[in-house]
């Protein structure tokens, strides 16, 4: 009986682990917004907001290194950047290192 219970628990763990390891696009974009908020506030004390338009995001699986940094996914699309005055529409690029690592680079370009 104990052996069956142990095998059942092991089988359940094997099935659940991949589901827990997966990270959604929304989670990745949240990581990008968090990194952007820190980075942009350091660069510009007047920074107020960076918000990604999740309806217009491209997600490219990369799984390679950029220099010495592993990057699993490249997100790019439209976002809103606000420092002083009204918000600006921008394009963004975010390099994400994967589960447990988070976003490692965020850059904006004017639209």
Locate the predicted segments by residue.
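Bacterial N-terminal signal peptides that target proteins for export
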Residues: 1-7
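Mitochondrial intermembrane space
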Residues: 20-111
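N-terminal signal peptide c-region/cleavage motif recognized by signal peptidases
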Residues: 16-18
